[in-house]
Amino acid sequence: MQKTEPKSANRTALVLFLAAASIVTSAVLYLGSAQTISSHPKETHLRNIRQLTHGGTNAEAYFSADGKKLIFQSTRDSYKCDQIFSMNSDGSNLQLVSTGKGRTTCAYYTPDGKRVIYASTHLGSPDCPPAADRSAGYAWAIYKTFDIFSAKPDGTDMKRLTSTVGYDAEATISPDGKKIIFTSTRDGDIDLYEMNIDGSSPRRLTNDLGYDGGAFYSQDGQWIVWRANRPKTADEVKTYKDLLARDLVMPSKMEIMIMKTDGSQRKQLTSNGAANFAPYFLPNGKQIVFSSDMNNKAQGIPNFDLYLINRDGSGLQQISFDEGFDAFPMFSPDGKKLVWAASRHGAKEGDIDIFIADWAE
């Protein structure tokens, strides 16, 4: 899963929220409270919007199974690259989960709430890894030092789950708590893999040339949704392979994909040539919420909004209408609340905060 940059006339749209984490005992940093904000009049699905974080770059907030906690990644205060934090779903009791070493990304609770998983570069170096080389255009860095770890929610009892050479990150957990789906370069391309919750028995799920990542299970465990880039022309294939050799990938064109967990019924849901990413199943299993810049009208100024689409690819509808960045949506387990990251109401340019709203059908 990734980091993204908000509205800026001299920046492109997405930044990989790739991060690294090592874990020790977490520390309580801040006792916050949610702040109710106004919304765009067209945002009829979003009621009672509250801002949960205030300042810094915050994203990929995911609920615990009981809906009481959120775990997310943040660059803030003295931390120069993303670290993992948790907080109550009202924004209170903010706690550092990772140690502040390296870069972290994509944290997720186990269904029983007893452990969390996330990816970290801290074994490669305690320092933040270098920024992506963008001399050839806007790109995400696919850090080879990323591995996936498991820990208790307070950051203790850290266990390494992957140890192959190359990028292992973007991990989420199946509803029964038995499997982890993740993205890896272990076989030479950027593909989806599934492994047991303890890191054993990994198996490859995708094998088409191109990036596959950011996968989530449906709540019934029958489906997987993810984002993918498929280079088609000779020039696109060459560019993709050249960037991959430098541990980079361009995210400007990605489409939303689904398949059954056994690999059958694979289907591409979007075909708009935009940057479609961060898909997540609604609890009903019939719809998917995701972020896209498909309606971006201003050149060079990223404008990402939230959208709904049916599992068969029909019924596309826009959910958010605020200018700037709206992404990384996730529903609470009961489907009553939506949490996401946005640049709206930022204290300064570059801020991305976590927001929560009551969901209205």
Regions found by a protein language model. Give the residues of each.
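Predominantly a core beta-strand signature of beta-propeller blades
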Residues: 48-49, 92-95, 138, 156-160, ...
